[in-house]
Amino acid sequence: MAYADSPENAIAVIKQRTALMNRCLSQHKLMESLQHTSIMLTELRNPNLSPKKYYELYVIIFDSLTNLSTYLIENHPQNHHLADLYELVQYTGNVVPRLYLMITVGTSYLTFNEAPKKEILKDMIEMCRGVQNPIRGLFLRYYLSQRTKELLPEDDPSFNSQFIMNNFIEMNKLWVRLQHQGPLRERETRTRERKELQILVGSQLVRLSQIIDDNFQMYKQDILPTILEQVIQCRDLVSQEYLLDVICQVFADEFHLKTLDTLLQTTLHLNPDVSINKIVLTLVDRLNDYVTRQLEDDPNATSTNAYLDMDVFGTFWDYLTVLNHERPDLSLQQFIPLVESVIVLSLKWYPNNFDNLNKLFELVLQKTKDYGQKNISLESEHLFLVLLSFQNSKLQLTSSTTAPPNSPVTSKKHFIFQLISQCQAYKNILALQSISLQKKVVNEIIDILMDREVEEMADNDSESKLHPPGHSAYLVIEDKLQVQRLLSICEPLIISRSGPPANVASSDTNVDEVFFNRHDEEESWILDPIQEKLAHLIHWIMNTTSRKQTMKNKIQFSLEAQLEILLLIKSSFIKGGINVKYTFPAIITNFWKLMRKCRMIQEYLLKKRPDNKTLLSHYSNLLKQMFKFVSRCINDIFNSCNNSCTDLILKLNLQCAILADQLQLNEISYDFFSQAFTIFEESLSDSKTQLQALIYIAQSLQKTRSLYKEAYYDSLIVRCTLHGSKLLKKQDQCRAVYLCSHLWWATEISNIGEEEGITDNFYRDGKRVLECLQRSLRVADSIMDNEQSCELMVEILNRCLYYFIHGDESETHISIKYINGLIELIKTNLKSLKLEDNSASMITNSISDLHITGENNVKASSNADDGSVITDKESNVAIGSDGTYIQLNTLNGSSTLIRGVVATASGSKLLHQLKYIPIHHFRRTCEYIESQREVDDRFKVIYV
């Protein structure tokens, strides 16, 4: 009988013959129905069908044969006897239809108790040898397996397992044989088809695992050796990978645990191209799942379950050692994932044993050296990145309610830190990698260590009292050695640069070009995320050393211990060269914290142990020593960065001076202020920068209190004022001098308990205040530009009003006569501005030209008698304390600097249009004076 020429026609034939078969069965015409069935089964003889199409036909035929089997069972033995039919169907002409009919009739007969089950089963499986075509034979044996699934003898598991084993062995042979049929050019196609058929073979192992259930002795003595022998003997890549994976998946975890050595030894005899790491990883996953289930059922399972006491790691370690010895050809791409899978197992079974990890990393280290560092490909680099950063290790925070009591490694953060502290081989492997790879790994390590999520979870748990006694999710650094090892890991980032370094060694490099490139690098100040992260790391290290609890005991780091750690950090980060401008401020900040802590200890000792002079002297000397360390850090920044960080160095000196003053160390404070003035004199050249620096120095000096002794304060404020009077631009001189007037008029600092009207020892000298204001007024009056002169005079007037409000005339020497005279002088200058424009309307037009339209226009008019200027609308142009012009946007609250335009357009139209600024400023001041008359009678004699 011929078969259809296409799958579609074959399906049509099968459906037609199925309908005819069902009709004959309904009419009890069994022989005719068997004839239709035989014709239908002929379609399974088609050699041109792909596995996918063959499966489609098989499914339809299976349903049809199920109907036939149901009829046979229901009509036995009334209309026929199945034993006779079993003999009858063996006369079918073609072997494929014959065997399908035999299996259908035979399995139908097996449903009855009188049937000789074992003989029929043996006969059917033996007859299946008649089909040696791989695809036909596989589906035929799969059909036998499906039909006999529930019909095997219940009282003889040995026979059942042997039956399935025989079927599996033959199916595997057919499956492997498929690879060697056809021309070589179709090899990839056949491999793809084989993978489509692999589930048929794997189903036999699934069925086998169901039959043996928990019978370990049968599995160990009969099943596993036979299966592994077949796997090894077939020498087929696809078969070996798939079957070992199925073995690991379908049989019980306890079986794998007890036969672990046998399974691992089998992988040593596989085809060299087999991906061993995939098989081992599957096995590891099963073993880890077993541990997870045991710990979930019983947190104390490590002491009660004998399986968990087995040396599982030792078995894997011996296996890796033998594998590395017998397979020196194994590439890094194959070896590293294999080691990584064992690391995963070790982390699950032995979370506290870092010696195991050190062994594994030593093995990888040796393999890397044997392989040759120059031979490491980009793919291998990625594998090292995954290995060293533990991306595949699934390290997650262990819940405090399910964690074993002997496991302090509660998070990936804890694990990484302990790894760095205890595994020297890990650091050695990292050191062998390229600089770029080292940076990536260290970057990820720092991200893990500084992850806030774990600590936030710990905070929440501690509030709800979820943590058991002695358990903490916080990471605590216990000694200086741990810090040293952590910093040694971070060295690639510490010494890294934002851009490529100049190639000084190149013979083609121009010396001048190298010099200027280095100069540009030093002068640049670009935000570097890596260095910013390192600065965060410094704070993280110091915070972790100051925590009070670890998982084992309570520990309070002494001040000296923290100081040693901070000095260790400094000695490591000094290697960064120009990068210290990013990291040293964090170190200095932590020095400041330790200084305050030292002062708190001193105050405690003075209160509790005032007679212990030795201890008090020790902490006093320690405090002074820390200021020396800070001074050294600041000098290191200057030496490494030259003039590119003068602003930072100036501010650090001033902050140290303020802190020393707060700690009543007036000599140290004076030294830091002197150093700040030295930086100002030697390193600052830009006029605006000098003005800003002087303002910052004046602000810092004004807050000091301990410098009053020994005339330190007088010396410094006079020096500050003199520098202000020597600035390049007169407007800067004027502003600097009138701002320095505050240095002779101290104000309250509420944080130290001072209060105006109660504290009577404020440093105040009204005569010097008046001298500063008079000097600044003379400078303002000498400026040739009337607009700037008027603006500065208005600013000086505001300062005079400040002193007039906050002090008596006898103290400040700012008299009403002086204020009235200053107001008259301002009015006179404003008249000059009006005369320059010929009319006040021109000022209004100038404001309109600045695109300040509509409701923001300033409508100005001039009073010819007193020179005052009145405006009825608010302007949206203002001037800063340093002379910066700012145009305000009243709609969205934003502002735009126009200082640069003004600075480059002297005498231009735009500068001419800004004349309304001093006018408006003076108007606001006059309005303030008028408003103060209601609350202060002294303002009534000030004429505006």
From Swiss-Prot:
The modification Phosphoserine is found at residues 846, 848, 868. Keywords: Membrane, Phosphoprotein, Protein transport, Transport. The keyword Membrane applies. It comes from the Eukaryota. It is a peripheral membrane protein. GO terms for biological process: endocytic recycling; intracellular protein transport; negative regulation of endoplasmic reticulum unfolded protein response; protein retention in Golgi apparatus; retrograde transport, endosome to Golgi. InterPro entries: Vps35, Vps35_C. One of its GO terms (cellular component) is endosome. It is found in: Membrane. Present with 2360 molecules/cell in log phase SD medium. Component of the retromer complex which consists of VPS29, VPS26, VPS35, VPS5 and VPS17. Component of a retromer subcomplex consisting of VPS29, VPS26 and VPS35. Belongs to the VPS35 family. Plays a role in vesicular protein sorting. Required for the endosome-to-Golgi retrieval of the vacuolar protein sorting receptor VPS10. Vacuolar carboxypeptidase Y (CPY) sorting is completely dependent on the presence of functional VPS35. The latter may play a role in the function, modification or packaging of a CPY-specific receptor complex. Component of the membrane-associated retromer complex which is essential in endosome-to-Golgi retrograde transport. The VPS29-VPS26-VPS35 subcomplex may be involved in cargo selection. This is Vacuolar protein sorting-associated protein 35. It comes from Saccharomyces cerevisiae (strain ATCC 204508 / S288c) (Baker's yeast).
